[in-house]
């Protein structure tokens, strides 16, 4: 049996990068249902088809129910549709919500003084208001099952880097909102945690830091362990915590390097 056997999971931003890597890992861990959400239907449907080909960890397990929903998480109407379609697919049962969808805004990112207001609002709507509305809409179903909410944050939401504009501000807000949700939901059995995945070799990170060498960054698949932990019953007593996904990856990389050096 996989670590996520019986779990129904909704993931936003699932058509590429970290979201796609999480969806694949969750399927391999035996999730009962996966609702994958992203803006572009063509990319999303390719991921859905990939997931359907993944062998389950044991007979009778695996992602038996997969739904792909093209939607914009900056739209309140789209969010209502996403949650309604997900609950319809899973017969009202939702165990895990992963708020992963994100945008960095204009590239290169302008300084705050020069930031267009409409672009600023779009980033906040996607990175902060969207997760708030997803939690708000999904929460009644999750309270019934003592679910897990995982918000994907950033180091830019923990340290005020110059030049990161609306993105950093939105991630600061997401960390604060995560702490508040965790406190307010503590008595309900729903846990809320947030994860800083670090720099990864994804399209978004390459656009954000074009001067850096992306081959030195982690691949998204390498940092999924913490998400499996938080989605599983292993974390049933963990809430209100911030995790850094790459700590595990870096320690594994160090051990691999040490082994090679001794040969």
Question: Each PLM stretch: what is its role?
Answer:
Residues 15-16:
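Conserved glycine-rich cofactor-binding loop
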Residues 187, 194-198, 202, 210-253, ...:
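C-terminal helical subdomain
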Residues 108-112, 116-121:
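Substrate-binding pocket helix/loop in short-chain dehydrogenase/reductase
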Residues 154:
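Residue(s) in the substrate-gating loop at a strand-loop-helix junction
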Residues 31-47:
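Conserved glycine-rich Rossmann-like NAD(P)H-binding loop of the short-chain dehydrogenase/reductase
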Residues 135, 170:
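Active-site helix of classical SDR
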Residues 140, 182-184:
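Alpha-helical segment proximal to the catalytic Tyr-Lys
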